Amino acid sequence: MAKKTDKGSGVNSTAIEQVSTASLIPYARNARTHSETQVKQIAGSIQEFGFCNPVLVDATNGIIAGHGRVMAAQLLKLETVPCLRLSHLTDAQKRAYVLADNRIALSSGWDEEMLANELSDLHADEFDMALLGFDADELTALLSMEDTAEAI
């Protein structure tokens, strides 16, 4: 049985620090994959919005969450990225969080009507829709759903 830490301890540091991309160590057993297309999407997002979501690392710069963001940063030739150090986690908790962080996000869904409204408004604002991560067919379907709702 894995040793547990105090569940109420939370993050023991909320300080975001800039860490050299060259010093970050990908988790060798990371089960999540990142296609070249997705890494380019993440890079586009970083260019448009900035690096808004820090990479989560352990005490030795091992990546716990943010492998795709680091790959995108390397593509953009960024020398440093914002990191949040999670030195309070046990080895088992780090391995589990690598999985949980990716899997739990997949359990969410979309309010398709609200999504269609937001996409329609962004489209009307002439925002670059390619930065949102939806493929062309998805955008067409969702925008036509909004057009249909407006016609009713």
Regions found by a protein language model. Give the residues of each.
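Aromatic/glycine/proline-enriched transmembrane-helix motif characteristic
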Residues: 1-152
